[in-house]
UniProtKB/Swiss-Prot annotation:
Residue stretches of biased makeup (Polar residues): 1-15
Similarity annotation: Belongs to the universal ribosomal protein uS9 family.
Database matches in PANTHER family: RIBOSOMAL PROTEIN S9, SMALL RIBOSOMAL SUBUNIT PROTEIN US9M
GO CC, one annotated term: cytoplasm
Biased composition (Basic residues): 154-173
Keyword Ribosomal protein part of the UniProt annotation: yes
Name of this chain's protein: Small ribosomal subunit protein uS9
Database matches in InterPro entries: Ribosomal_Su5_D2-typ_SF, Ribosomal_uS9, Ribosomal_uS9_bac/plastid, Ribosomal_uS9_CS, Ribsml_uS5_D2-typ_fold_subgr
Domain of life according to the entry: Bacteria
Source organism of the structure: Cutibacterium acnes (strain DSM 16379 / KPA171202) (Propionibacterium acnes)
GO BP annotations listed: translation
Region (Disordered): 1-26, 135-173
Length: 173
């Protein structure tokens, strides 16, 4: 460890860029997306964290290697989301990435309604999985559309209208 960084650079060998390297560097796969479970290597299991948003809801998510336990605002998944549809929405990223039951989830969710919170948690989990191991999980999550923030929000009410677009009844005479 007595070598300085400049001495290490002087000892390295420089190889020219060949046509064979160009083919590898610019190769495009005919099928770049990978379906769930089709990745070349198993997904890496490591801790990760991310934030997800949907409508007015914000979810701060931490995933830790474990046995698949859920803590959402201090409650279990079944207690926080009693509706099976919401439970399925929330667990979908793990199934898509092929790591069901490999992580414990700790989440703080605030704002919005139940469906918005489920969507925010789903996005947060997908982003956390992507942060942990992008090579294994990103293609499947991206293909399923789970890494995209749903930008749809409620439209504001306009002056002179009853709601965002509903106008008062119009009388011709």
């Amino acid at each position: 460890m007595t070598d300085t960084p400049t001495e290490n650079l002087e000892n390295t060998e420089v190889t020219p860029f060949t046509e064979g390297d160009r083919e590898i560097a610019y190769r495009t796969d005919s099928n770049p997306t990978v379906a769930a479970g089709d990745s070349k290597r198993p997904a890496m299991i490591a801790p990760g964290a991310a934030t997800g948003r949907r409508k007015e809801a914000i979810a701060r998510v931490r995933i830790i290697p474990g046995s698949g336990q859920w803590k959402i605002n201090g409650r279990t998944l079944e207690d926080y989301f009693p509706n099976k549809v919401h439970q399925q929405i929330v667990t979908e990223p793990f199934a898509t990435a092929g790591v069901e039951g490999a992580y414990d989830v700790i989440a703080r969710i605030g704002g919005g309604g139940v469906t918005g919170q489920a969507g925010a948690l789903r996005l947060g989990i997908a982003r956390a999985l992507n942060n942990v191991d992008p090579e294994a999980s990103r293609p499947a999550l991206k293909k399923a559309g789970m890494l995209t923030r749903d930008a749809r929000v409620k439209e504001r009410k306009k002056a002179g209208l009853k709601k965002a677009r509903k106008a008062p009844q119009y009388s011709k005479r």
